[in-house]
Curated annotation (Swiss-Prot):
Keywords: Ribonucleoprotein, Ribosomal protein. It holds the Pfam family Ribosomal_L30. Belongs to the universal ribosomal protein uL30 family. InterPro entries: Ribo_uL30_ferredoxin-like_sf (IPR036919), Ribosomal_uL30_bac-type (IPR005996), Ribosomal_uL30_ferredoxin-like (IPR016082). This is Large ribosomal subunit protein uL30. GO terms for molecular function: structural constituent of ribosome. Coiled coil: none annotated. It comes from Acidovorax ebreus (strain TPSY) (Diaphorobacter sp. (strain TPSY)). The keyword Disulfide bond does not apply. Part of the 50S ribosomal subunit. GO terms for cellular component: cytosolic large ribosomal subunit. The gene is rpmD. One of its GO terms (biological process) is translation.
Amino acid sequence: MTTQQTIKIQLVRSPIGTKESHRATVRGLGLRKLNSISELKDTPEVRGMINKISYLVKVL
């Protein structure tokens, strides 16, 4: 059985004033409030979502 790698991301900029699709991506990653941290599986799908909103988040 293999262990799944995880990635931690933190919301460092408010999504107010951004595109609706970017706000939906932030919610899809499990981020709600500013400086909230979410730990997710490191998959190509999650990496793509992080890349889309890279100006809003920081990878820890």
